[in-house]
């Protein structure tokens, strides 16, 4: 054998122990993953701790190999650096002590045989708090830190470190579906609970490690019995489908009234933002009942794939997300638009008050000519068409919805299975639902109260006036107040207050209901909340449909009467007056009558002296005839051949014939005013063919005979 070969063999033999040690230290995972602990020498040699993280931990010396198999402090330092994010997360105040005790165990000359590591209680305390955080990041609990490897207790046979205990005290204020105890950061409540043992029916919950929240099982009966859930399903679904039907009819009327000048069209245009918002809210409820409870409210979570849970993060469920979006965003937008309309009504009342004008001016939509009514818009219409107001009314609810999505507080409720905000988080219900609704309601209510006070002052000023025209203005103002938008806004505000009351009562008592474990939870706040949410839309739809149905009914009645009167006039050849009145005309002091007596023309007979006198009342827009009681009014053929209403008015005394029936010496006069209201058949005919109806006159807003 050559000397060089012998030399190489000696070098390999001498270096063999170091190669084995380096290979072992270079693959710590293999040694740490082995189930059997490493061989520990009978007497250990203590060395100073050189790892920065474990200095000033409570002891200064350690020995290698450690309890997880590492033989060099440099390898241990590299391994501990991988736990730095978990340490910064501060899931447990004892985490650093536990890691140092496991990877850099304490060594003392008084006990040179065994390294002193952590006790099992210290390991389990840290594992309970930090394992969910690791799972949230997608990492399992390290096998090298299995708590079963460590001593159960500290005694004279097995020495270990028990730790000082957790510094964080259990939380007293808990989130809905949470419990007192140590939590992880996140959510509106600061720290979310880590287990579900604080709940009365904890076996019906599954704790989600990533979020730390407790999700109830899909079919769990925690607060309500199955019979109560069935009753609530029938009650709310009935109102939801009724509201959906009204919403469809109101939408058709809204689209059909575009450009119309009827009163119903004015209401539709003014309330169009509220109508569209409540259309979407009603559609959201309809989607919930059409898809079903399971399809909307139940699902699986990646952290618990084997359980069907009530949704706590509804953004992953398309049906749940759509129901939430339509209910929450458009519901908040409806509250914002109601507040805007209250502000507009207040401005409109104050703008026409005597205090601001120095005299009484009836608003343009109360009376006056059509040109004036079209040229002067109300304050509500001005606000609904203002770009800044539209941006605020649509933008604030959008900001709220974005906050809910970022915080991931979209969840389903147990009773109805409808997705919303705060069903499983009382803090979210308080901050993201009750607070904004309360702000909108306070703003709108203050404007309503202020406008009502101004309106009462205006009525008092008018009531103290003796002028007849002012008294008539008072009647018009009172009529507008009883049927105007102020009444609607007041009714809407009451319904909104009931909704707010139900929300406040729910988040104020939900902790008591969950902690008691009693299924006798009151139904009324939950049913009232859902009912009022739908009733707000029903009020809007009914308020728009009311004038439309009334106008349609009056038009049908008016057309039927006109056809009947026209047939009677064609049979006799003379029509002395049209009486197709569409409403009550008792607004004047004189008696309103219609004449249908038909007389044969007597053009060849000289006319007797006129027994009546034509009087015009410019203040009321009417023509009065002082007529003897035993005379009937007829119209000559010569008069019907006139083509100018002005000419007819000028020569009216010469072309009327009066035929006495009885004694001419007893003359009793009665004042009669003949007119046709705006919108009647005769008024429409005059506006279309004025030259062919010379016996009709257009006076202001009325068609007069």
From Swiss-Prot:
Domain (FZ) ranges: 41-163
Bias kind Basic residues: ranges: 636-670
Membrane topology classification: Multi-pass membrane protein
One function term, GO molecular function aspect: transmembrane signaling receptor activity
Parts of the chain on the Extracellular side: 23-233, 292-322, 408-430, 505-529
SS bond list: 46-107, 54-100, 91-130, 119-160, 123-147
Organism domain of life: Eukaryota
Cytoplasmic topological segments: 255-270, 344-386, 452-483, 551-705
PROSITE patterns for the chain: FZ, G_PROTEIN_RECEP_F2_4
Keywords: Developmental protein, Disulfide bond, G-protein coupled receptor, Glycoprotein, Membrane, Receptor, Signal, Transducer, Transmembrane, Transmembrane helix, Wnt signaling pathway
Similarity field: Belongs to the G-protein coupled receptor Fz/Smo family.
Protein name as annotated: Frizzled-4
Gene transcribed to yield this protein: fz4
């Amino acid at each position: 054998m050559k000397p060089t070969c012998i030399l190489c063999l000696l070098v390999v033999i001498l270096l063999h122990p170091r190669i084995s040690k380096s290979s072992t230290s270079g693959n710590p995972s293999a040694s740490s993953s082995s189930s059997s602990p490493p061989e520990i020498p009978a007497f250990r040699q203590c060395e100073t701790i050189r790892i920065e993280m474990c200095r000033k931990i409570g002891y200064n010396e350690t020995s290698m190999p450690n309890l997880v198999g590492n033989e060099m402090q440099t390898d241990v330092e590299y391994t501990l650096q991988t736990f730095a994010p978990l340490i910064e997360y501060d899931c447990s105040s004892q985490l650093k002590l536990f890691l140092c005790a496991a990877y850099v165990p304490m060594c003392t000359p008084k006990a040179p045989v065994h390294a002193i590591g952590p006790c099992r209680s210290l390991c389990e305390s840290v594992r309970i708090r930090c394992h969910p955080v690791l799972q949230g990041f997608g990492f399992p609990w390290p096998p090298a830190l299995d708590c079963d490897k460590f001593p159960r207790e500290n005694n004279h046979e097995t020495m270990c470190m028990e730790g000082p205990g957790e510094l964080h005290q259990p939380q007293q204020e808990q989130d809905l579906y949470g419990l007192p105890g140590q939590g992880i950061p996140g959510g509106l409540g600061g720290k979310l609970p880590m287990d579900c043992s604080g709940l009365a029916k904890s076996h019906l919950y599954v704790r989600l490690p990533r979020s730390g929240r407790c999700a109830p099982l899909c079919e769990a009966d925690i607060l309500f019995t199955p019979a109560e859930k069935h009753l609530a399903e029938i009650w709310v679904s009935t109102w939801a489908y009724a509201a959906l039907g009204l919403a469809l009819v109101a939408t058709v009327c809204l689209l059909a009234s575009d450009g119309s000048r009827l009163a119903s069209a004015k209401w539709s245009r003014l309330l169009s933002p509220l109508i569209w918002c409540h259309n979407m809210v009603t559609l959201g409820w309809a989607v919930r009942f059409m898809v079903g409870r399971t399809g909307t409210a139940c699902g699986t979570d990646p952290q618990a794939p084997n359980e069907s849970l009530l949704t706590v993060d509804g953004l992953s469920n398309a049906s749940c997300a759509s129901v939430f979006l339509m209910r929450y965003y458009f519901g908040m937008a409806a509250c914002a638009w109601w507040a805007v309309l209250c502000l507009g009504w207040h401005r409109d009342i104050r703008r026409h008050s005597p205090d601001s004008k120095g005299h009484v001016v009836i608003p343009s939509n109360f009376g006056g000519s059509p040109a004036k009514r079209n040229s002067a818009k109300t304050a509500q219409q001005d606000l609904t068409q203002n770009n800044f107001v539209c941006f605020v009314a649509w933008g604030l609810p959008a900001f709220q919805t974005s906050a809910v999505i970022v915080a991931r507080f979209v969840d389903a409720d147990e009773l109805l299975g409808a997705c919303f905000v705060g069903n499983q988080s009382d803090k979210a219900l308080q901050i993201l639902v009750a607070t904004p609704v309360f702000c909108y309601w306070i703003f709108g209510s203050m404007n309503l109260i202020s406008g009502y006070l101004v309106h009462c002052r205006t009525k008092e000023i008018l009531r103290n006036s003796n002028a007849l025209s002012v008294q008539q203005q008072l009647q018009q103002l009172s009529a507008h107040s009883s049927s105007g938008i102020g009444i609607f806004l007041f009714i809407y505000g009451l319904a909104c207050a009931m909704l707010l009351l139900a929300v406040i009562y729910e988040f104020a008592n939900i902790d008591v209901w969950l902690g008691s474990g009693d299924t006798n939870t009151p139904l009324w706040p939950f049913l009232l909340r859902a009912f009022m949410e739908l009733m707000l839309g029903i009020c809007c739809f009914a308020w728009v449909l009311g004038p439309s149905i009334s106008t349609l009914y009056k038009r049908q009645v008016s057309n039927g009467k006109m056809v009947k009167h026209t047939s009677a006039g064609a049979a006799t050849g003379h029509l002395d007056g049209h009486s197709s009145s569409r409403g009550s005309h008792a607004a004047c002091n004189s008696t309103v009558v219609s004449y249908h007596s038909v007389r044969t023309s007597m053009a060849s007979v000289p006319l007797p002296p006129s027994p009546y006198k034509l009087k015009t009342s410019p203040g009321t827009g009417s023509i009065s005839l002082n007529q003897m009681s035993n005379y009937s009014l007829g119209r000559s053929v010569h008069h019907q051949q006139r083509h100018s209403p002005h000419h007819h008015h000028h020569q009216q005394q010469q072309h009327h014939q009066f035929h006495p029936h009885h004694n001419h010496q007893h003359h009793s006069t009665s004042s009669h005013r003949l007119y046709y209201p705006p919108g009647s058949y005769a008024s429409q005919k005059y506006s279309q063919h004025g030259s062919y109806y010379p016996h009709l006159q257009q006076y202001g807003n009325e068609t007069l005979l």
